[in-house]
Amino acid sequence: MSKIIGIDLGTTNSCVAVLEGGEAKVIPNPEGSRTTPSVVAFKNGERLVGEVAKRQAITNPNTIISIKRHMGTDYKVEIEGKQYTPQEISAIILQYLKSYAEDYLGEPVTRAVITVPAYFNDAQRQATKDAGRIAGLEVERIINEPTAAALAYGLDKGEDQTILVYDLGGGTFDVSILELGDGVFEVKATAGDNHLGGDDFDQVIIDYLVSQFKQENGIDLSKDKMALQRLKDAAEKAKKELSGVTQTQISLPFISANENGPLHLETTLTRAKFEELSAHLVERTMGPVRQALQDAGLTSADIDKVILVGGSTRIPAVQEAIKRELGKEPHKGVNPDEVVAIGAAIQGGVIAGEVKDIVLLDVTPLSLGIETMGGVFTKLIERNTTIPTSKSQVFTTAADNQTTVDIHVLQGERPMAADNKTLGRFQLTDIPPAPRGVPQIEVTFDIDANGIVHVRAKDLGTNKEQSITIKSSSGLSEEEIQRMIKEAEENAEADRKRKEAADLRNEADQLIFTTEKTVKELEGKVSADEIKKAQEAKDALKAALEKNDLDDIRKKKDALQEAVQQLSIKLYEQAAQQAQQAQSGAADKKDNVVDAEFEEVNDDK
C-alpha cells in the first residue's frame, strides 16, 4: 500500500512530509530546500515550478504567485492564449511536490492529506480537493492548518492542555483553540481572515517605497511592472531581515530613469518604521484571537500554550502583540514553516493505521443554512460545530398550492441571506398542491470530515427526495476534472521527455569532451586510422547535436562510445604487447650471460 504524504499547500511556500518509522520527516526538494515557493511560470512552452520560477519572476510576466488567494472563485489566469483555473495552477505545484516525494521514497505516491486554512469555506475546500485529483492524488482528507500544527506539536505530549494556534501565512490568517488530552485533539473554536497574510506586510513596505520615490523623483514606480517586481523582492527581503536586525538597507540601482539619466532607489528602513507601517495589520490579527476565545468560552488565562505557525509569525511586532493579548510568551519549539506539513503526514499515518490512539475532532468554521421567507438566513449548523455532523429541520411552503421549493444553501454569519456566501441552489419539485403551511419539507445538512457539505430536501408527505453535494459556482464538473487530469498527465510526460532530452544532450556533450581528451592522450600511441574513426564519430555527434534530432543524437552517441571503446581496447592491446616484448627481451638477455671460470690465488704460497 502506498504511503500517504502530508502536503501544506501554502500561499507563498509549500511543504511535503511523510511518516517513516513512526516519525514525520520533511522531504527536501531537488534544490535541497525543505520548502518550495508556490510559484508557477510558463516559458517557451515549458512549465517552471518553485525556486526556478520565483527567480525569473522579475523578467517573466507569465509567472503566477499566491494563486491560493483565488481558490474557490471563478478567477482565471490567461497564459500564452490558454486559460487556467486556480485548481490547475495549484495542481502543477502539487504535481511537483508529488514527483520529488516519489524520488525520495522510491515508489509511486497516489494518496495525500492536504491542509487548508481553517477559515476556508466549502468552495475553497472543494477546489483544493479538485487540485489534488488533477495532480493525480487521491485526497484522503482535507484538514485545517492550525489543527495539523497542533497534531505535530501535541503528538508526544502526555498532559491535558488547551492550546491556541496562531497561524499567519503568506495570504491567510487563522486562529484555532484546541484541547489536547489522551490522544484526543478537539478543536473548540476557530476564527480567521482569508485575506490577511505576509503578502500584506510586504505590500505596506512596497507602498512606502513607492511614495518615497515619488516624493523625491516625481515618478510612480507602481505603474512599472518590472520595477514593481523588484520592489516586491526587496520588500520581502527587508521584512525578513528586520526580524533579526533593527534596520536594513534597501538598494535598487537603475530602478527607473528620467531625462537626466538613470535613477536609483537607496534607503534605510528601520524596524520601528516597519512596525508603524504594519501596526494596523498586526491589530487586525487580534480580532480573530478575541473572537476564538469568546466562541470557546475561555479567557486568555485558560490558554496553556500559544503555538506559532507560518513564516510571518517571526515578525517581532506580531510576537509582542500576542504576548500582550494573551499574557504569555509564544512557544518557539516548532518550525513555523514545516509544522503544518508534519501534522498532515501524521494525519496520513492515522488514516493508514500507522499511528494509533489519536482522534482528531475538527469543527466547521462558518455557519450553514438556507434562505427562508423575506430573504432571512436560517442557520441549521452553527459555526464551531464538531465535524462530521448532520442536522435536519422541517420547513413548509410560503404560498398556497406551491408545487416547487427552491433550496438556497448559504454559508456565513450575517442575518440576511444576501450578505452570506451562496454555496448552491437546487429545487424540490412535484409537491402536491396544498394550502401554505401544510406541506412538510425536511432539509438535512451533512458535513463530512473534510468539511465538505451535502444537502438534501425531502417532502415528508410523498417521501420524494432531492439532494446535492455542494458545487460552488467555481466548482469544476467531473468532465472538466477528467480533462485537467489528462492534461496534467500529458504535461508530466512532456516534462519527463524534456528532462530526458536535456540529460541526453548533457551526456553527448560530456562524451565529446572526454573523446577529445582521450584522442590527445593517445596520439602516437595507437594507429592514425583508429584516431580518425573516433574523430569522425565525434564530428557526427556534434552535427546531430546542432540539428537537435534526439534519435540521431542517441545513435551517434552510441557510435562514438563504440569508437572510443575500440581506441581503449587498442591502447590496452598495445600496452600488453609492449609489456610482453619487454618481458621476452629480459629473458633473451638472461640467455646471453657467460659463465666465467675463476681460480683462487693464494698469496701466502
UniProtKB/Swiss-Prot annotation:
Give the molecular function GO annotations. ATP binding; ATP-dependent protein folding chaperone; unfolded protein binding
Region: Disordered; residue ranges are 579-605
- Residue spans making up a coiled coil are none
- Can you tell which superkingdom this protein's organism belongs to? Bacteria
Regulation: induction: By stress conditions e.g. heat shock.
Q: Which keywords are on file for this protein?
A: ATP-binding, Chaperone, Nucleotide-binding, Phosphoprotein, Stress response
Phosphothreonine: residues carrying this PTM = T172
| The keyword ATP-binding is assigned to this record | yes
Q: Where is the composition biased (Acidic residues)?
A: 594-605
The record ties this protein, via InterPro entries, to: ATPase_NBD, Chaperone_DnaK, Heat_shock_70_CS, HSP70_C_sf, HSP70_peptide-bd_sf, Hsp_70_fam
Instruction: Name the protein family.
Output: Belongs to the heat shock protein 70 family.
Described by its record, this protein's role is as follows: Acts as a chaperone.
Protein name, UniProt field = Chaperone protein DnaK
